[in-house]
Amino acid sequence: MKVVILMALLVLTAHCVPVSRFPGKIFLYCPFFNRKHCQRFCEFFKICRKPPLSRRTTVVPSFPLTTEADLSLTGGPLTPDRRGDSR
């Protein structure tokens, strides 16, 4: 049974390339033909990286967007005063 599991692991990782950006940890890049197989393998073993084209590049803000923050930043009504009025 152990031999079968080891052979299956070797077959699945035959196309994986080790990534050396993270010293001390082993991460594998899996260029399988089917992306679902690679994702399942990576999620199961937690040792694979996603291919570079499928990574997210958008940044999600880590703070809550509330109206109270907007009111505290302005400090008052947004109407022009005498000094800022251009006549």
From Swiss-Prot:
InterPro entries: U9-ORF (IPR054417). It is found in: Secreted. The keyword Signal applies. Residues 1-16 form the signal peptide. Disruption phenotype: Following high LPS dosage to induce severe endotoxemia, knockout mice display significantly sustained sickness responses and reduced survival of 33% in contrast to wild-type mice which show acute clinical signs that peak at 12 hours followed by recovery and survival in 86% of cases. IL6 levels remain elevated at a significantly higher level in knockout mice at 24 hours compared to wild-type mice where levels peak at 4 hours. Minimal intrinsic effects on macrophage function. It comes from the Eukaryota. Expressed at highest levels in lipopolysaccharide (LPS)-stimulated bone marrow-derived macrophages and thioglycolate-elicited peritoneal macrophages with minimal expression in other tissues at steady state. Transmembrane segments: none annotated. GO terms for biological process: innate immune response. GO terms for cellular component: extracellular space. Glycosylated. Induction: Induced in macrophages and dendritic cells by TLR activation in a Myd88- and Mapk14-dependent manner. Keywords: Glycoprotein, Immunity, Innate immunity, Secreted, Signal. Plays a protective role during endotoxic shock. This is Endotoxic shock protective protein U9-ORF.
